[in-house]
Amino acid sequence: MNQYAASQPSRKKAVFSLLILLALTCVIVLILRDHWAEITAALAQLNLWQVLVVLALGISYPLLEGCVSYVIVRGRLHGFTLRQGIDNAWCGTFGNVVTLGAGAVPVQTWYLHQAGLPIGPGVGLMTLQYVFHKTTVLLYATVMLLLQHKWLAANTTGVLKYLPMAYAVVALVIVALVLVCVSPLVQNLARWALGFLPKTEKWQQRRADWLEQLDVLGTESRLLLADKARCVQIFALQALKLFLLFCLPWLCIRFMQLSPLSFARVQLLTSLMLFVSNALPNVAGMGSIETAFLLLYSSFLPSGEVMSVLMLYRIASYYFVFAASAVGFFLAQRRLTRTPPKEA
């Protein structure tokens, strides 16, 4: 397995990534500056308990992601605990930011390897967890669209007219990713396509690594999909994770006493926001969410209110979660040094 499949983020790279994060935050603040008075007035409506509820919903996302890790890994690594699953989620969240979006799976694989799981199965299981997440995002957005497509069509203007095209493109990408993981036919086609890579030493090494990862992914997917009860648990946890995340903008609107937008409408718009963000470029999880949020919500709320909701939503779902993940990551490291690894 490729030596970069499992890696611990370096301190130098982490500092550089934090500087990039700070720069991007400054850019967002500059974008919001014309509505700063409205944003601060809206945030001033919040009391302590409302802030705690919003932050609790934000932190529920990585905690439920940790529950998913626990359910996925425990069948492969006997003795893997719920706390280790949550530690693994902290590693993924922290690694995703400090490696500018490239390191969630490698850092999680590194943690699982330290906990006793070989690198190959670790990469396979974390890739499958990612695929379960993307599949649930697709299914959730599709159900919301089916239930409320008439309302959305009647209120769609401007760039939102291109939403069906964006939906189709992202859906095709997610379906292709799922098929690579679960379909032997598609895996064989992928192996055949890799045979057309350049015959240089560098590309042939990459081909060998990718072929090995395909084999491991096929093995792990067959083992996991054979356990139907575990798959149902994973989908249920993923759906709950998304439901709570999609409740967050609705609570932000209610707590800041902004223009009313029903709970069902917010569920639809936020699920589409997360879905469409998959088609947009991002750096360390920033950029795509903000763009998709403004795109979806600007047709239904005044500009100042959209900016206010976006600000509180990102504080709870990104900045607070990242700060918690930094603490969680270093505590996970400390626990690893105190606990001998268990064999898979």
Report each predicted region and the residues it spans.
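Transmembrane helix-loop-helix hairpins in multi-pass inner-membrane proteins
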Residues: 1-41, 92-204, 282, 286-344
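Membrane-helix interface segments
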Residues: 10-11, 47-49, 78-87, 117-119, ...
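Membrane-interface helix starts
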Residues: 13-16, 45-53, 222-236
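A short amphipathic helical element positioned immediately N-terminal to and/or at the very start
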Residues: 38-45, 213-225
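Hydrophobic alpha-helical transmembrane segments
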Residues: 51-55, 82, 86, 123, ...
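Membrane-embedded helical hairpins/re-entrant loop segments and their flanking transmembrane helices
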Residues: 64-91, 252-269
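Alpha-helical transmembrane segments of multi-pass membrane proteins
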Residues: 83-92, 128, 264-275, 305-313
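Transmembrane helical segments that form the transport core of multi-pass membrane transport proteins
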Residues: 221, 225-272, 280
